[in-house]
């Protein structure tokens, strides 16, 4: 059995990652693949927390740009993350992996409310904990949720899984063939150069709490495990 480099991780999944190539909605094949990858690392006794975005179903910024009240649009986005989280929980439990969804907005009929100490206890019992509904506050992204929850549960690393890129580049590799991929970066580099890794609030939170971040592609099966056991994949962001 491979020895994991990290004992407790936060896996950040964008909503788009769950949509796969169809671009929106929830792709059952993709979510099953992600669940299998999570099972691989859970079987290494890694404590796994997951933060899921909602962009495959709804984006608060899109609603705001169309004239909606920003807070209302963001709350709709939080509800989208709950739908994604329940879908992921179902896929995990189909594979025999115990999991719990905790929401920042109370909806006790479908999930537990977020309680930090309870989340940590679930992790210690090797249950996968899925954090849904963002931070529970409008104007904050699910990237910031991942940074906040990682700090709260004292995670060793954030694994940021992307579905359309395999790391951080100095330009969009889909538009610029000369784009160069970074192997390592500091959070100050990310903030100073305006690199599209995560928003500035999330980057600052990770930097202040010294939480390393690995950005990699979710589309290649086995990549989550490769990141956890310390193989060099994607881009690692750490320190000042």
Swiss-Prot record:
Gene3D superfamilies in alphabetical order: Acetylglutamate kinase-like (3.40.1160.10)
Domain of life: Bacteria
Reaction it catalyzes: UMP + ATP = UDP + ADP
EC number: 2.7.4.22
Compartments reported by the entry: Cytoplasm
Entries under Pfam families matching the protein: AA_kinase
CC terms in the record's Gene Ontology section: cytoplasm
Enzyme class: transferase
GO MF assignments: ATP binding; UMP kinase activity
Involved in allosteric activation by GTP: region residues: 20-25
Regulation affecting activity: Allosterically activated by GTP. Inhibited by UTP.
Keywords: Allosteric enzyme, ATP-binding, Cytoplasm, Kinase, Nucleotide-binding, Pyrimidine biosynthesis, Transferase
Gene Ontology biological process terms, A to Z: 'de novo' CTP biosynthetic process; UDP biosynthetic process
Annotated binding of UMP, by residue: 54, 74, 135-142
Main location: cytoplasm
CDD domains xref list: AAK_UMPK-PyrH-Ec
Sequence positions that bind ATP: 12-15, 55, 59, 163, 169, 172
Subunit structure: Homohexamer.
HAMAP family: PyrH_B
Family affiliation: Belongs to the UMP kinase family.
Entry protein name: Uridylate kinase
